[in-house]
Amino acid sequence: MYSLLIDTHDENVICIIFKDGKVINKKEIKSNMRHSEITMPALIELINEEGIKISDISDIIVNIGPGSFTGVRIGVVIAKTMAYLLNKPIRSINSLEMLVYSREELKNGLYKVDEKNGYFVGSFDENGNLINEIEYYSFDDFNTQFKNKEFVNVDKLDFNNIYQNVIKKKPINPHLVNPLYVKKIEVLK
């Protein structure tokens, strides 16, 4: 069983193929704001390197953000289109869940994801469930609001652990998978 993970929420495009729940190939490419040019060729290359066909993919996982508005939309559209056209299950994960699920043992507490002008913050319980809405804080607001708060530290994403947790989620109708927008688009401010 092959699974595909697509993550385009920040400056890197990450595409991973899992076989029976373990990472067998991964592409992580610094995109320099060229997600739309890089993501599909990276996916095709990844699949070709494994000698499989696109139809061999049994399910798709996509990071829905928060993160780069354009980056997230690109990954979500590709994942939704593939899931719909190939009639494959799709599951979504948000950027903070990627951190939570990377841990060997799930840990309750505050998690944060860096963004160019601040942080996305969420609180999770010991089962990896989001307790509150993910919120965005500028660096100044963050330093004021969370001055004496401790955050759970995740040094490195563990994609095998992420897979083991996200695969437990119920698949979603591809038409219902949407980017997670937390802050307002800059141009609308």
Predicted features and spans:
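DPxDG-like acidic metal-binding loop motif
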Residues: 59-90, 95
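Oxyanion-binding and handling regions
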Residues: 1-22, 91-189
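A general structural signal for well-ordered alpha-helical segments in protein cores
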Residues: 36-40, 79, 159-160
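Buried hydrophobic packing segments
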Residues: 43, 78-82, 100
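N-terminal beta-alpha supersecondary unit
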Residues: 1-58, 135-136
